């Protein structure tokens, strides 16, 4: 039985949680009665004195990775998880200082989201994920009616480079008056397969992590493939590239890899093994980790944590909670090769669209994003300039007619994990619809 209203979803307190000045809610929304698909959400509200703040839906990618695991627990969420999952620490740069942040685990089978139709996890794809997410939103606003008509944004990273524009398009086309969509933001996201491949391989070669021969081979084998369903020739070329890259963190080129050894292959310190375990298109899945991921895995498998979150209530999830679902990831179905047509439609509709990129990510690197956005052919209103945070260069930005591109200096794939302060600055400017701040005049 769906609880009446949102009060039943209020989180009293999470195990090991510090005292806070904001409310949290979590629970399930059934998106397909027939199939028994139910999506899990976590809402971290802004404090009372920041209200009425906008509502922002955050989506992680994969496909098959949990927004609770990544976004909420090691990036922009209110807390970071302590080693061994022993408790939580307040994140000084949490995004719910300035917005009400809603994390959604999707599709069903990811994180705490579940389905009673076991075949669902073998048949997921972009289209059903978008429609289920839309169904989730429509019902969520009924459970939280005080958020109806509130300024609403959709944001996400990585494979959410598909989810975010696809869901934004559905919301925009639905003309649902309750959902007041103002814009979207994508970080280190897949945008256009061809341009993303071109930019990714160029970045690898440019940063000296593949040989000249392999660079040529990657371009010959992969450029006309789908990112999600590469050909055997492209797979073989990326295997060679992976061997050449060695044991580095492709999600954050210049930070150490986690060296906690563990029996499972996904947490093995051998990167080639780690990447193989993440499916056929190795640079899309999983996430940056010197070990933060392990802490989340320990924490969210605690029964007291699940009870506090109203998650896995019946104990029906007879499997270990995981940050990502390999099954969903390796059996992904429809994945359009380009989001550019959606960008064009939503730019024309006047939505606020920002694309940001951590410039040390080698998985969906800045170069890929610059080529993909360049392919839109938008006129420039402010050309590439350095933006500043506390008189230091935080990154660079270019403002186009209808779209703002921002790089974040020294950040990997998960920008708020690596550069939490700069990420919060970026988020605040996005919400205000103001360009990133240039050098202040009075600086020495």
UniProtKB/Swiss-Prot annotation:
Entries under Pfam families matching the protein: Peptidase_S10
Organism expressing this protein natively: Triticum aestivum (Wheat)
Annotated signal peptide: none
Family (UniProt): Belongs to the peptidase S10 family.
Binding residues for substrate: 60-62, 157-159, 409-413
Name of protein: Serine carboxypeptidase 2
Residue positions assigned to the propeptide: 260-286
Keyword Protease: yes
Keyword Disulfide bond: yes
Family annotation (InterPro entries): AB_hydrolase_fold (IPR029058), Peptidase_S10 (IPR001563), Ser_caboxypep_his_AS (IPR033124), Ser_caboxypep_ser_AS (IPR018202)
Record GO biological process: proteolysis
Subunit-structure text: Carboxypeptidase II is a dimer, where each monomer is composed of two chains linked by a disulfide bond.
Catalytic reaction(s) noted: Preferential release of a C-terminal arginine or lysine residue
Assigned keywords, A-Z: Allergen, Carboxypeptidase, Disulfide bond, Glycoprotein, Hydrolase, Protease, Zymogen
Residues the record marks as active site: 158, 361, 413
